[in-house]
């Protein structure tokens, strides 16, 4: 399966002056090389996400093998048909720092919507019961997502990952005290609404992610993405908010560590 050796040595601490936190990404079998390349450009901390039971177990194993890498465990809406059985036990792992990614995807509808809603509801309940953060994936389902959060109680630390909304959706997230994570999508020419949301998002509610290997930012769009590329999105956010890269990196890292 995964040929991972315990890498407790600090990987090349040449790293850049600016230190970034990728929250989240999807690490796999080539995690060691990807993490080394990330460290070389100052991406020193990462959360790797689970999307079903098997991938959550892989995420936990990777987090166990590398310093400053943590995992989430959850059932993505695409996998909702399989239910949440076995998830609760994975959340007991010391490497797991959040429930997710969980949510609703009415764009692809890979699972029936009623099953998506039930599985999302169960994961909100788990996050609340275990006092854990919740990482949300929502696509073409903003109203339904907010309705379920309101019905079940939005967990204290809730993150809307890979945010694709605009200022209106941002306000709905912030009104529920949630944080918002921006990916390489923000660099796409078509993402003017996302950039408008970045401009309005309070720095203390802003997180950064690659969602790698997906969504490589401009100028790398279309390539396989990895955590090292977070600097492109970070620079864009610094430009939009008239901040330095260091200020964005420090704030988003502190936000991720809360």
Mark where each language-model region is.
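Mid-domain alpha/beta scaffold segments of enzyme catalytic cores
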Residues: 3-258
């Amino acid at each position: 399966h995964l040929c991972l050796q315990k890498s407790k040595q600090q990987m090349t601490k040449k790293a850049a002056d600016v230190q970034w936190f990728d929250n989240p990404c999807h690490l796999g079998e080539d995690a060691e090389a990807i993490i080394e390349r990330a460290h070389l450009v100052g991406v020193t901390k990462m959360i790797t996400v689970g999307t079903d039971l098997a991938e959550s177990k892989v995420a936990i194993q990777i987090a166990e093998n590398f310093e400053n890498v943590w995992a989430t465990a959850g059932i993505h809406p695409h996998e909702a048909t399989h239910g949440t059985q076995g998830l609760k036990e994975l959340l007991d792992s010391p490497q797991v720092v959040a429930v997710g990614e969980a949510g609703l995807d009415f764009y692809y509808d890979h699972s029936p919507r009623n099953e998506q809603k039930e599985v999302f509801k169960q994961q909100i309940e788990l996050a609340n019961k275990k006092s854990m953060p919740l990482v949300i994936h929502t696509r073409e389902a903003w109203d339904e997502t907010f309705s379920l959060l309101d019905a079940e109680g939005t967990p204290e630390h809730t993150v809307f990952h890979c945010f694709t909304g605009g200022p209106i959706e941002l306000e709905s997230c912030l009104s529920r005290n949630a944080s918002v994570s921006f990916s390489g999508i923000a660099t796409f020419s078509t993402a003017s609404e996302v950039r408008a949301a970045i401009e309005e998002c309070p720095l203390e509610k802003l997180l950064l992610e690659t969602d790698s290997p997906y969504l490589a930012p401009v100028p790398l769009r279309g390539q396989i993405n990895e955590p090292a590329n977070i600097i492109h999105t970070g620079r864009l956010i610094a430009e939009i908010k008239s901040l330095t890269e260091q200020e964005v990196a420090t704030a988003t890292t502190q936000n991720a560590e809360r």
